[in-house]
Amino acid sequence: ILGDEIAEARVLDLYAGTGAIGFEALSRGAAHVTFVELHAPTAAAIKASALELGVAKRTTVVIAPAEKATTRLSGRFDFVYADPPYASPPPHLTFGNLRARRLVDASTTLVYEHGERGDAFHSPGFTTVRDARYGEVMLQFLRTVEIAG
C-alpha cells in the first residue's frame, strides 16, 4: 500500500486504531507521522508503542474525532490514510477540511479504506487514481484536483 513514496514523507494516519499504517510508514523512512485517534486509551497505546520503538520524536498523536482534528492540524501532508469504522459514511467533512486548510495538494496521495459493502468517496475537488481490493477490504487512492469555477 505504502510504496516507495513514503521515504521522507509527512504522513497523516486518520482513524489510526493501533497505528499499524503509521508505524509501517515510519519503518519505511517517513519523516513524521501524525496519528489521529478518538479513543484515548488507544491513542495512549500508540504513544507507548512510539516510545518503545524509538520513534516518538517522529510522531504526533492527536486525540480527537478526525473531522475536528483536521481543523487544527497545520503543515502539508504527503500521504494520508483514512480508515474510518466500516459502518461510517465516507469522510466528506474530514477530507474537505484537509483540502480547505491546504493540508493536502495535488501531490498528496490520499487512501480511503472501506469495506466491500461501503460507499466509495466521491466529492468535487478529488479524483480517484485507482482502486484496489484485498479480500473484503477496498482501498480508494485519491488526489486533489482544481475545482472549475
What are these regions (language model features)?
Residues 1-149:
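Class I S-adenosyl-L-methionine-dependent methyltransferase catalytic core
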